[in-house]
Each structure stands twice: as C-alpha cells, then as structure tokens.
C-alpha cells in the first residue's frame, strides 16, 4: 500500500474487503472511481472508502499464511454489523517497561547457559563420553536446535498472539497442533542429520568406524532432539498464553526462556539417553535401530498435522534452508572452539563460550522477534515497500532513532555488561573454569561481548527488514541465522581475546591452565 494515495489506488480498512457499490467521488480534483463503501469510524461517523474493482482479484500469498486467517473476512452488504475484528494495536512500551520485562528472562537464560556449562564439565568424564567420543560432536549441533527450532517457535507464536490469531479456542488449538507437529518433523530430521555428521567427523581423523557406535549416536541424537523439542514446545506455549493474559509482551519473555531451558534440558537429555543406551551396548544392540525406526516412523503423522495448519504449511516446505545453513555456521564456530581449547594455554576458554554465545543469541532473538511482530502489525511480507529498505540501515538509525525498535535495541545493548558481570561472578563462585577474573581479563571479555551484541543487533535490523521485503516471514527465517552468527562471533571474539591476553603477558598460573 502506497503512503501517497492517488486516484484508483486500492484502499482497505481492518483487513475487510466489502463489495463495492457504484458511486463517484466529489472531492476536489478527483476523478470518478470504481466504487465506494461506508465504514463506521472510531466516533461512529461514516467514513467513505474508495475501492478499486480489480482489488477483488488479488489473492493472498502462500508465504503469508500466518496472516491468512486475519486478513480476510466475509463480504456483506451490512458492513456495520458484519465486519472483521480490528487488528490489535501494538502494546505501548517505554524503555523502562521493555527493560523490566526482559530483565528476568534474560537473567534466567544466562543462568541456564552457566548451568549447561557446569553439566558438560561433569558429564565429560562419564564412560560414554570417554569411549564414544563422537558424542561431543553432537553437543553443539543439538544445542543449536534451540535457535533453529524452539526460539523460532517462540517468535512465531509470539507474533500470532500479538496480532490476535490465538484469541479463540479454535485458533489456539490449530496454532498449537500445527506448530508442535512442525517442530517434531524438524527435530527428527535435524537430529538424524546431526548424528550422520558426528559419525563422519569421527571417522575422518583416524579412519575408525563402528556400526554399534553409529547406531548409538543416531538413537541418542534423534531421541534427544525429539523429546527436547516436545518439552520445550509445551513450555513455550504455556509461557506465551500466560504472558498475553497478564498483559506482558510475549516477544520479551518467550525467546529468552526458550534459550535458558534449551541448553540445559538438551544437554541433560543427551547425557542421560546416551548413557542409558550405552549400558545396553553389549546386551541389547538391536534396541538402537528400533529407537531410530520408531521416531522416523512417526514422521508421516507429524507431516500430516503440520500440513493442516495454514500457519505452518509453508514453513514445512521452505523452512529447511535456514536450519541447515545455521548448522553449518555453528559448525565453523565449533571448529574455532575445538582448535582453541585443544591448546593447553587456552583451555580456560571452554567454560565461558556457552555464556557469551547464549547471551548474544538470546538478546538478538528478542530483537528479531519484536521487529517481526511490528512488521506483521503493519502489513504482509513483501507487500509494503516502505517497511523493507533496499540499503543497509545506518548504525544511527538502528540505535538512536525514536521508534520503538531502536529503543528496544538500546535497552538490550545496555543489559550486556551488568548481565555478564553477574554470570562471571556466578562462575567464579562455583569454581568453574581455569581463569582468574582479573581486571584486564574482564575488560577484554566485556569488549568481546559488547562487540558481538552490537554487530548482531545491527545485522538483525537489516536482515529482518530484508527478508520482509523479499516476502519471507522473519519469524521462520531470521532467528536461526542470527543465533548461529552469535555462536560464530562469540567464539571467534572470545578466542581472539584469549590470544591477545596471552601475547600481552597475562599468563598467570590460572589462565588457560
């Protein structure tokens, strides 16, 4: 819709398309148009709206299925009594209200990443991790599902809740079943692919291949991905519904909670399932292919359920590209981590990597979800050129403009330093890692964290609008890329910080010992 109406432009109010009646406009300098219809304004007065007859031939695009149910209403001659509901207005938020709503989930997410690091420090000494070392390769791939699936689910459901597509029981049930079925399909497929990657990467270095170990990895990966997605999906649905009922913007709380629980639950499940299956390695080996076959056999059921919902049908067919590419990006970050911590001088980096990666991914996921919700409230993907700038925005526009998205970017950026100070202090109190929290270390660590989040927030501002302009729903496509970039930037900048610290002489007996 153009911002400068001219004769024969198409006008539409509240997503309603009433039938046109022949009439001509008597406004000054305006030629007769195809037809007009009357609407009731906010004060009850009649408002005459000009409608071009050819507008009725315009269909709804498939990739905008999420908005499909709310963008059209039944035509009626009596539009005053048979109009579609007005689209909900965005919540009025100040910087203080945004910060207040984000703070608790942000801290919860950070403590979740700290807990996940502590769990990994314990389970790495279990026999299954010592004998089947390829399980370590599964860790970053399965933890990446948090950004690829759960956080995308949280963003998608938050947008649906904010634009009124979960207000009735029928809409709510359809949205829940479709999205839960969708993430089960994605989790099963990604879990299977992750196990194949683990087998290949474990075989390449020494040329050793074990069929029982391969089945163990496949069963552990698929079962972990399936159960983790099921549990986290149910939690996300409860959080979003509860947030909407008490007047909190779900965009501010859903994605951080998904992140906080995602790492911990996924890592705990992977450790427990792989350990339990490993105990049966020498007795019931046939249980491994049976577990794999069971979850694969459920795929057709989830596909049928996901196809029934317009909100997930398009994602089922086109939502695989970001998931696969995000795994590749995260793998590069994993390669940096592997090469860095394998050097005894930098072994202390391991405990901080989940924290810096998790915090950056959580903050950018909140911002991406908020921008996507704002765009959905103002139109449909690909149809509003004003919402999709052709060029990259300037940093001043991203962080210092008066609009609500710039305000939220400033709030999220200001949370980085106090949040990381709390998490570093927690790690120190729990005696995690091998690094003394000296002043110079904290300065380098904070510099890396601030630079990571600054880059991510800027990329999110550009990427979400760019995807919107190309007709892609940012809820489905942006967050996997952004969280994967967060892993890559966080790991790379942290590794660079440790190398610089070593070069300038910060080599006390604790750093990297």
UniProtKB/Swiss-Prot annotation:
Na(+)/Mg(2+) ion exchanger that acts as a predominant Mg(2+) efflux system at the plasma membrane. Transporter activity is driven by the inwardly directed electrochemical gradient for Na(+) ions, thus directly depends on the extracellular Na(+) ion concentration set by Na(+)/K(+) pump. Generates circadian cellular Mg(2+) fluxes that feed back to regulate clock-controlled gene expression and metabolism and facilitate higher energetic demands during the day. Has a role in regulating the activity of ATP-dependent enzymes, including those operating in Krebs cycle and the electron transport chain. GO terms for biological process: cellular response to magnesium ion; intracellular magnesium ion homeostasis; magnesium ion transmembrane transport; magnesium ion transport; metal ion transport. Phosphorylated. This is Solute carrier family 41 member 1. The lineage of its organism: Eukaryota, Metazoa, Chordata, Craniata, Vertebrata. One of its GO terms (molecular function) is magnesium:sodium antiporter activity. The exchange activity is regulated by phosphorylation in a cyclic AMP signaling-dependent way. Temperature-sensitive, reduction or elevation of the temperature significantly decreases or increases its activity respectively. It comes from Homo sapiens. Residues 1-42, 60-91 are annotated as: Disordered. Highest expression levels in heart and testis, slightly less in skeletal muscles, prostate, adrenal gland and thyroid, and weakest in the hematopoietic tissues bones marrow, lymph node, thymus and spleen. In the kidney, it is expressed in the distal convoluted tubules, macula densa, and thick ascending limb tubular segments of the nephrons.
